[in-house]
Amino acid sequence: MDFLTQRATEQSYELLAHLEHVLLYDYRRTRQIAEDEKDRFGCRSVAKDLMRTIETFRDKVNADQQFVRYKTLVGFESVFPPHWEDEEFDFGEVEKFRHERAGEYIDAISEAAEDEWYRVVERCASTKSDDMATFPVFGEFLCRLAKTKPGVATRFLGRADDNVLNFLPAFLNGLKESGSDEEYRAVLTRYLAGGKHLVAIARHFRKTGTVSSDSIKEVLKRAVAASDDIAVIEVWFSRSKDMNRKSTLVEDVFVPAIKYLIGRKDARWVHGAWFLGKTFFPVLSADHANLVLDSLVSLPRIEYHAERILVYIAGPHPKAVWGFFGRRLAEKREEKEESYEAFPYQFHGLEQPLAMNVKLAIGSVRSLFRAGDTLLRFDGGRLLSTVFPAFPEPFAQKLSDMAANGSDEDVGFVLGILQNYKGEAATHPVLKALVNRLSEDDPRLAQVDISLQNTGVVGGEFGFVEAFREKKAVMASWLDDPMPRVKGFAAEYIRRLDQRIASEQRSAEQMKEQRKRDFESDDMIDRLRG
């Protein structure tokens, strides 16, 4: 502690705030020992000494008024006087304390003290952090300063470096509320003309609700000209809540913004669009929804935020979403990057609107299939199995009709889909229709065999044995089917299944015996497993 105290004045405010936070909890733990009158651990005096050294460090660092101001305005580990006496001094009380002090700081800023307080602002703004919990109090402080003392805020901006200008939205928000329209317009015009702080201006527009459409269009125009993707996204978001089919903002802002982002193949906007939800995406026209989908094609994978957007669009425009996945499947086949995923292995809500129209779902994927397409099982077929994981009856009926009455291409299409399932009972009507359709020597019957034998993950030494026995039991009903081809296929399949069961049984027993010999006893095997 003496080492830290001696060198405290040489350390950054960021480090001092963190050290004080850590030492606060050491102090609280030590106090329990120091106040133990029975001295159960025999170190009460040592604990008291440690408390005194921590207090010495605390008092020294807090003697620096600039540090106290800094930790009040910046950070989330800041420690204040009530923390040392009251362990119940919670987050809500801390925030109240900080906001009250920030108000006092604003009151203390006079023309004579501007230089001193600008240095405080400059030091706070120089803090490097990507944690959103670092600057809320500081941002509110700047907003309140600009609102109550617009002249001071304007002069601060006149000398601001890049770090301070990172907080330009807070200044603009305050100036907008200050009632000093002339100063507000002058600042806004200056930074808009400079074209270097378009993101900040757009974020300010998101905060205020009284910005003219001409101002928004001007920022968008400059952002596009400067190839500032983030600024374009922020301009779109700034008035997204006011965009509906009757609003000119859709054509004037959303359409040029999304078309620009499509051209840039930049879909980062999805990570900030979650808050738009039902107020924006479901009310888009078909043409506008397709623009959103065009932009999403460039995403390397469909994650949570993108799926939420697709759910909103799939309700009114399911055909467009199926077409979107068709484009992603084509992109996957052409894309050299292995990281590109056309669709996730499991949906978390999108399957519901997509499964509402079975005919549309199957027809959309069928339109992508051509004879001899060996990849169907791994893309389009898997997409359908992801949307219909339980193989519902309407889905089964449509596939059965295709298997029985469709073309040879339809048969290949159905086979590619079924290989994504595990021979569940729900798939059997379709498989029977295929068996009845195909001749006994048709090589495609091997794909029916594969569909029936798929098991997924099994467990235990005799996992495959048990899985195949269950499949054999389910297949017994096929032997009573009125269709001769189905009966004959079932008898032959069960015969091969018996051979497979016997083979798996022998293999499992041999491996078990070999382990016994290698590890001497079952007890040793159990110990190794446990």
Question: Residue ranges of each PLM-predicted region?
Answer:
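Non-catalytic all-alpha helical scaffold/repeat segments
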Residues: M1-G530
